[in-house]
Amino acid sequence: MRSGLRVLLGLTATVTLGAGIVVPAFTASASASSTYAAETWHWGPTASTDYKGWATGKIRSTSSGLRVSGDLYDAGGARTCSWVKIKWLTDHGRYRTATFKNCSQSTPRAFSVNTGYMLSAEAKVCRGTSTRITGRCSGWEGVWSQGG
């Protein structure tokens, strides 16, 4: 469907009336080269093994690669936090990680990381203190892979 729209963006249709008058039926003003259509993939929820922390999110294409974003929820007790760890494989064959925490116990925390061009991404949710992950982690869940 998107490739069909790209073809139509550069075309102008005309309708010929009975008296030989040609009237433009529609005119597409945007060209395919000036328009950038971002794609979005959703993932989650991924939960810690005690189900007191979970994360959901999306991966969105940008002009400089991909962006992984989402919300981290914390339903744990006092002095505990939920952590989400994102791991991705770059197009250069290197693994990178980003870690985010939420200690609010009531409000989801938004997170976002620009990954650039990547081959795959995984996420896991853990429990911990305000300074480090202590355990009760989910397994690595594949959230995005190039080619499906």
Predicted regions: what is each one?
Residues 31-148:
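Post-signal peptide N-terminal regions of Sec-secreted extracellular proteins
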Residues 1-52:
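N-terminal prepro-regions of secreted/extracellular proteins
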